[in-house]
Design a protein with these regions (language model features):
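Cys/His-rich metal-chelating microdomains
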Residues: 691, 738-741
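Glycine/proline-enriched, intrinsically flexible loops and inter-domain linkers
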Residues: 2-125, 133-152, 156-655
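Eukaryote-specific, cytoplasm-facing alpha-helical/coiled-coil scaffolding segments in long proteins
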Residues: 360, 417, 757-766
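Glycine-rich phosphate-binding loop of nucleotide-binding enzymes
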Residues: 128
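Extended intrinsically disordered, low-complexity coil regions enriched in Ser, Thr, Gly, Ala
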Residues: 678, 682-713, 746-757, 761
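Flanking scaffold residues of small Cys/His-coordinated metal-binding clusters
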Residues: 679-680, 727-730
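Short Cys/His-rich Zn2+-coordinating modules
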Residues: 660-680, 711-722
Length: 767
């Protein structure tokens, strides 16, 4: 049964109660609240640049203040926070450079407050609102916002806000990542925006209500004060700017920042063809004991200067794997910001004037209340965010200048959560999540290789935590942390490698562990335009090993495989299993996807990869078609013969292949071009002009199709049957004329071939 989209549900109230809050085009704001809207239009360039950069630095100082006051691993090492500045009516001026999806849900919170709090209890100078309701605008319950209106002479001038992940806010699982919850009623406290600061005084009754459900109230109270300090700092800096330059000038700068961002965005869109771009990915295991796979669809439609994002075809909400409307929207905004708004200091408001989000409520990433959403940022939101990189990259590829901005899906595209708790070395209770997967990897570019352990692209300034700091804070001893050979997706440009962290308990008798993951059977970092997928997430667990004897003898292992012991297969939502001092636990996070056909990678680059232990000799041959001699050189004749033989094997063997000879009008992807023939617009191979069908066709239907196990795409991908029942496959689509690789896709064996690119003929005919 087809479920309706938001745009088709005209009689439904999207007010953040049952359905996620969808701000109307015109907000209903109480007349009690006076808004400062006057803005100077004539601002000299020097003043504009000074104030513009000052506002950016207000945001940076806001985030740094939270880090300094909190001092927690969440703020200092995970950088699981982000500040924002918004106009009086909730348009973004700036995102912060930390965890950017946190800002992506901020404008919905601010607009909801304007609509539902401006009358009662009112919005006044000296107030701040606390909020973590995902149906109003939060990633999940643990990401708490402190939202501060900034007033000037009795009028609401703008908003400064921040969001910070909290240690624990209740629920059935310590840390509040409730991987077995079936509804929000089993998760942490859920708070629609509530006035926690009134007249510059903390309301003790609201703070005590907020802290009561937490297992770590002291830590949450400290982080609340860190957020408070951040908002106060940002508010004071904005007021100082107003005092120096005047409210009209500062507001005028804000308006111009947004207007300039809009103009830059429109200029880019006008250079791109109209069309539809689709990405398909999968989530595994929505609750403990589940072996299912769940489809996640992203559709991007471009018509003129308007973009529309949809999720039609995504699986219905289920188990503990969901996200809300604001989470899905905020995730996509991160990719939109980084690929199309990076030159505007992450000011996405101008772009948002021309972007619509039209998901299907009741689905996995647009769930209705009271779905379980506490795991959203590490599962549902990541699987919503990362495919947007590929869809947007394919859209902008046709423009030679914008092609330089393309970035494939990065590492940790599904977070392999290792949630641990117990009593630490000081006999104090603790609970936390291993932050190491933040090290991620950056996807390949259209112009070069990705970045190994380069972080998560959703967090531009993220950093890998120090092993020593983790050991100091928690009762763990790391055995090693290393990059994983062959983990990056193969391609003309290789995706960045991911890494593996391995640890044992230290100065404690037992650690209670939970797993919470997806992307362990089906890779969630596929390549693009012929690039191969990266490795999956991997849990490795060995019981009763000889590690303590090795440590005593000063013989540290280089890998968990070096140890004697019992191998245990951990499931993706396994709860309350124990790790004792002789038990060794290793976690590998997914790497980044590759760009372009691996057979087109320079052989010398592959040799360097082998020298650097980025690629094994076997993978050099199997994936890249490069023969490495015993003394480490490239066997040039052997490499040419191997590559030519593979291309020849993938050509069409029966019948003649038509070649197009008309006008080549558009380079759609690295491997696909558009021709104008006498018979109309047709698609073709970029290498040999072999006919791949009319523009209205799915080009894949005209390719030679090969289907194989996922291990042929990446040697580190293991047996899917450990976790799921549906068989995933690696599909490849080759040119029938020359055997060149046109595109790949990862899919369940029974799923239809994806039409990932659909140019609109009217637009295509103009080019």
């Amino acid at each position: 049964m087809t479920m309706p989209k938001v745009s088709q549900m005209r009689d439904i109230a999207f007010d953040g109660r049952k359905m996620g809050y969808v701000p109307p085009k015109k907000l209903t704001i109480s007349p009690k609240l006076r808004l400062q809207r006057k803005a100077a239009a004539d601002i000299d360039p020097i003043t504009y640049e000074v104030v513009r950069h000052a506002l950016w630095h207000v945001n940076e100082e806001h985030g740094a203040t939270i880090q300094r006051v909190s001092g927690s691993p969440v703020a200092m090492y995970a950088l699981d926070l982000n500040p924002s500045i918004l106009t009086e009516d909730g348009e973004f001026v700036y995102f912060g450079p930390y965890m950017q999806y946190m800002s992506g849900v901020t404008d919905t919170q601010v607009k909801w407050i304007l609509e539902y709090r401006s009358d009662n209890p009112g919005i006044r100078d000296g107030d701040m609102f606390l909020a973590n309701d995902p149906w109003v605008g939060a990633a999940h319950q643990q990401d708490v916002m402190l939202i501060c209106p900034v007033f000037w002479k009795g009028e609401l001038f703008c908003w400064v806000t921040n969001c910070l992940h909290q240690y624990d806010l209740g629920g059935i699982t310590p840390s509040s990542f409730c991987g077995s919850a079936e509804s929000a009623f089993e998760e942490g406290i859920c708070i629609p925006p509530v006035k926690i600061v009134e007249g510059n005084e903390i309301r003790r009754d609201i703070e005590e209500l907020y802290l009561r459900s937490s297992r770590k109230p002291e830590a949450v109270a400290l982080d609340f004060r860190a957020q408070l300090a951040g908002d106060i700092t940002a508010r004071d800096r904005v007021l100082a700017l107003i005092g120096r330059y005047g409210p009209d000038v500062v507001k005028g700068v804000m308006r111009r920042v947004i207007d300039n961002a809009e103009a830059a965005f429109l200029k880019k869109l006008k250079r791109l063809p109209d069309g539809v771009w689709r990405e398909r990915s999968y989530v595994e295991c929505c609750r403990p004991g589940d072996r299912g796979t769940y489809c996640v669809m992203l559709t991007l439609r471009k018509t003129g200067t308007k973009l529309v994002f949809e999720n039609e075809g995504t699986a219905p909400q289920a188990g503990a794997m969901n996200a809300t409307y604001s989470g899905w929207r905020g995730s996509i905004m991160v990719a939109l910001n980084q690929l199309l708004c990076w030159d505007q200091y992450f000011c996405i408001a101008g772009a948002l004037r021309h972007v619509e989000f039209d998901p299907t409520p009741g689905t996995f990433n647009c769930a209705n209340f009271p779905a379980s959403v506490s795991t959203a940022p590490i599962q549902a939101m990541e699987i919503s965010l990362y495919p947007a990189y590929n869809a947007l990259s394919k859209m902008i590829h046709s423009d030679p200048e914008m092609r330089n901005d393309i970035m494939c899906i990065g590492g940790t595209s599904q977070w392999p959560a290792t949630i641990f708790r117990g009593t630490d070395q000081w006999d104090e209770p603790y609970g936390y999540i291993l932050v190491d997967p933040i090290g991620g990897a950056i996807g390949a570019f259209a112009t070069g290789d990705g970045i190994s352990t380069g972080g998560q692209s959703r967090t531009p300034i993220c950093k890998l935590p120090n092993v020593e700091h983790t050991e100091q804070t928690f009762p763990l001893l790391f055995l090693y942390r290393k990059e994983v050979i062959d983990s990056g997706g193969a391609g003309r440009y290789r995706g960045g490698l991911s890494a593996e962290s391995c640890f044992i308990p230290h100065h404690t008798g037992v650690i209670t562990q939970d797993t919470l993951s997806s992307g362990n059977a089906i890779p969630t970092s596929p390549g693009m335009m012929g690039g191969y997928p990266a490795t999956t997430n991997v849990y490795k667990f060995k019981r009763q090993t000889d590690i303590l004897e090795r440590v005593a003898a000063r013989r540290m292992p280089a890998d968990i495989a070096d140890l004697q012991g019992e191998d245990v297969t951990l499931q993706l939502r396994q709860e309350n299993f124990e790790q004792r001092p002789g038990d060794v636990y290793a976690v590998i996070w997914s790497a980044a996807g590759g760009f372009g056909d691996p057979l087109e990678r320079e052989p010398e680059s592959v040799r360097e990869d082998v020298d650097n232990r980025s690629v094994s000799i076997a993978a050099a041959r199997d994936l890249y078609g490069v023969v490495i001699t015993p003394d480490g050189r490239v066997d040039d004749p052997g490499t040419r013969d191997l590559r030519d033989g593979r291309r020849d094997a993938n050509r069409k063997k029966d019948g003649r292949v038509a070649r197009l000879k008309g006008e080549r009008t558009l380079r759609i992807t690295d491997n696909l071009v558009l021709y104008r023939e006498k018979t109309g617009l047709r698609l073709a191979c970029s290498k040999c002009a072999a006919d791949l069908g009319a523009v209205r066709d799915n080009y894949k239907d005209h390719c030679v199709r090969r289907e194989s196990d996922l291990s042929t795409a990446n040697p580190n991908i293991g047996d899917y049957r450990r976790y799921i029942d549906d068989r995933p496959v690696f599909r490849q689509f080759f040119c029938p004329g020359c055997g060149a690789l046109i595109e790949n896709e990862v899919a369940r064996a029974n799923d239809p071939v994806l039409r990932d690119i659909e140019l609109l003929p009217r637009e295509a005919s103009k080019r």
